[in-house]
Amino acid sequence: MTRNGLSHAQDDLWPAPFRHGSPVSGTVAVPGSKSLTNRYLVLAALASEPSLVRRPLHSRDSALMVAALQTLGAAVTPLPDPGPFGPDLRIDPVRRSAPAADPVRIDCGLAGTVMRFVPPLAALHTGQVDFDGDDAARVRPMGPVLDGLRQLGVHVVDQGRAALPFRVLGTGSVPGGTVTIDASGSSQFVSALLLAAVRFDSPLVLRHDAPGGVPSLPHVEMTLQVLRDAGVDARRVDERSWRVVPGDVAGLDVTVEPDLSNAGPFLAAAVATGGTVSIPDWPQHTTQGGDHWRHILPRFGADVTLREGVFTVTGPRELRGVDLDLSEAGELAPTVAALCALASGPSRLRGIAHLRGHETDRLAALSTELNGLGGAVTETLDGLAIEPTALHGGVFHTYQDHRMATAGAILGLRVPGVQVADIATTAKTLPEFPRMWAELVGSEG
């Protein structure tokens, strides 16, 4: 895999703290879920009255979402007395009968939720909305969302790219109806249309029609649950179709759960070193894919408990290899792969072919960078095969991918001399990561 766009990487190397064989232990409070934060923000912008989102994630992805919604006419106001990870937010929704507006531009950055969730909202806007983002975002697939909008009668201009940049010419309304898309590349294609459907003129029936299922299905269930909690008639019709009935959405007053996917690197620190790490405020029931940590980490030999909202992981003396289907929680794969590279036995990660279309081609990136540290990793049709081998230090490139950066940090706990290029890319979903990591594991590289 080539390292395009990484000419600056050698100038920004972060020495990953090395633990010299000592266990990592501590308690880590994790900021709010990115997936929930951005869903709540979108729904609040579509509501009929102001909303309050408590303990939202403040990161590049959520800031891009806030800016996009403000561009379309919502007002987002930080409230006083911020907590440890930033202020609560008041959202005044987009006016429904706004007059035609001058052309506007939305910067998606590298945020999948922005580039996919906001175009259907732009169709409800009156006027021209241009979308673009980072260079790396221009290779992320957008076809199913744009195709779905066209089926609904929305005028979309993309010069046949099915990717950024593109233009949506909104008329202020979308009729609704039945839409069929190929959602095998991302569950976000489904969530994008379901969220906006609360403001369509008639019900939306959305069908996935392609070989194979929809990856990361818990994220679709998360979208449905967020809609239902707001009083919307939203449901799964069958394994491949969903239905949303439009209607007024009351103002939200919600508290965002901690981001359980972002809890992963801190839990992995305990697993990799035989320590004990606790995450407070872990929900008993959740639609977050990160809740799979409760089932994944014991496969490596770790002990896990969830008592009174505190999830605690104690690592084993020796990491076992694993054989895991991660189709429902692909965002956990970089952290899991880092642990597999430290395990004493072979591992196989399956069901994650769709990661080739994430912030980077994560399968190619993981195999390239792990092998660059002496690993024995092979890409398979739908995942990775990882053999045990002795690793050595070196530069771990991140490809502007936040989860690649945290994977490199995990490896550095056990492998001296690992240098992570562009640790600042963690600002995408966890700006505080370098500080939080140093507080938990120490700062010695």
Swiss-Prot record:
<keyword id="KW-0028">Amino-acid biosynthesis</keyword>
<feature type="binding site">
    <location>
        <position position="34"/>
    </location>
    <ligand>
        <name>phosphoenolpyruvate</name>
    </ligand>
</feature>
<dbReference type="InterPro" id="IPR036968">
    <property type="entry name" value="Enolpyruvate_Tfrase_sf"/>
</dbReference>
<feature type="binding site">
    <location>
        <position position="403"/>
    </location>
    <ligand>
        <name>phosphoenolpyruvate</name>
    </ligand>
</feature>
<feature type="binding site">
    <location>
        <position position="331"/>
    </location>
    <ligand>
        <name>3-phosphoshikimate</name>
    </ligand>
</feature>
<feature type="binding site">
    <location>
        <position position="140"/>
    </location>
    <ligand>
        <name>phosphoenolpyruvate</name>
    </ligand>
</feature>
<comment type="subunit">
    <text>Monomer.</text>
</comment>
<feature type="active site" description="Proton acceptor">
    <location>
        <position position="331"/>
    </location>
</feature>
<dbReference type="GO" id="GO:0005737">
    <property type="term" value="C:cytoplasm"/>
</dbReference>
<feature type="binding site">
    <location>
        <position position="39"/>
    </location>
    <ligand>
        <name>3-phosphoshikimate</name>
    </ligand>
</feature>
<keyword id="KW-0057">Aromatic amino acid biosynthesis</keyword>
<feature type="binding site">
    <location>
        <position position="187"/>
    </location>
    <ligand>
        <name>3-phosphoshikimate</name>
    </ligand>
</feature>
<feature type="binding site">
    <location>
        <position position="186"/>
    </location>
    <ligand>
        <name>3-phosphoshikimate</name>
    </ligand>
</feature>
<dbReference type="Pfam" id="PF00275">
    <property type="entry name" value="EPSP_synthase"/>
</dbReference>
<dbReference type="InterPro" id="IPR023193">
    <property type="entry name" value="EPSP_synthase_CS"/>
</dbReference>
<dbReference type="InterPro" id="IPR013792">
    <property type="entry name" value="RNA3'P_cycl/enolpyr_Trfase_a/b"/>
</dbReference>
<keyword id="KW-0808">Transferase</keyword>
<dbReference type="GO" id="GO:0003866">
    <property type="term" value="F:3-phosphoshikimate 1-carboxyvinyltransferase activity"/>
</dbReference>
<dbReference type="InterPro" id="IPR001986">
    <property type="entry name" value="Enolpyruvate_Tfrase_dom"/>
</dbReference>
<dbReference type="GO" id="GO:0009073">
    <property type="term" value="P:aromatic amino acid family biosynthetic process"/>
</dbReference>
<feature type="binding site">
    <location>
        <position position="428"/>
    </location>
    <ligand>
        <name>phosphoenolpyruvate</name>
    </ligand>
</feature>
<comment type="pathway">
    <text>Metabolic intermediate biosynthesis; chorismate biosynthesis; chorismate from D-erythrose 4-phosphate and phosphoenolpyruvate: step 6/7.</text>
</comment>
<dbReference type="InterPro" id="IPR006264">
    <property type="entry name" value="EPSP_synthase"/>
</dbReference>
<feature type="binding site">
    <location>
        <position position="216"/>
    </location>
    <ligand>
        <name>3-phosphoshikimate</name>
    </ligand>
</feature>
<dbReference type="GO" id="GO:0009423">
    <property type="term" value="P:chorismate biosynthetic process"/>
</dbReference>
<feature type="binding site">
    <location>
        <position position="34"/>
    </location>
    <ligand>
        <name>3-phosphoshikimate</name>
    </ligand>
</feature>
<keyword id="KW-0963">Cytoplasm</keyword>
<feature type="binding site">
    <location>
        <position position="188"/>
    </location>
    <ligand>
        <name>phosphoenolpyruvate</name>
    </ligand>
</feature>
<feature type="binding site">
    <location>
        <position position="35"/>
    </location>
    <ligand>
        <name>3-phosphoshikimate</name>
    </ligand>
</feature>
<feature type="binding site">
    <location>
        <position position="112"/>
    </location>
    <ligand>
        <name>phosphoenolpyruvate</name>
    </ligand>
</feature>
<feature type="binding site">
    <location>
        <position position="362"/>
    </location>
    <ligand>
        <name>phosphoenolpyruvate</name>
    </ligand>
</feature>
<dbReference type="GO" id="GO:0008652">
    <property type="term" value="P:amino acid biosynthetic process"/>
</dbReference>
<comment type="function">
    <text>Catalyzes the transfer of the enolpyruvyl moiety of phosphoenolpyruvate (PEP) to the 5-hydroxyl of shikimate-3-phosphate (S3P) to produce enolpyruvyl shikimate-3-phosphate and inorganic phosphate.</text>
</comment>
<comment type="similarity">
    <text>Belongs to the EPSP synthase family.</text>
</comment>
<feature type="binding site">
    <location>
        <position position="358"/>
    </location>
    <ligand>
        <name>3-phosphoshikimate</name>
    </ligand>
</feature>
<feature type="binding site">
    <location>
        <position position="188"/>
    </location>
    <ligand>
        <name>3-phosphoshikimate</name>
    </ligand>
</feature>
<protein>
    <recommendedName>
        <fullName>3-phosphoshikimate 1-carboxyvinyltransferase</fullName>
        <ecNumber>2.5.1.19</ecNumber>
    </recommendedName>
</protein>
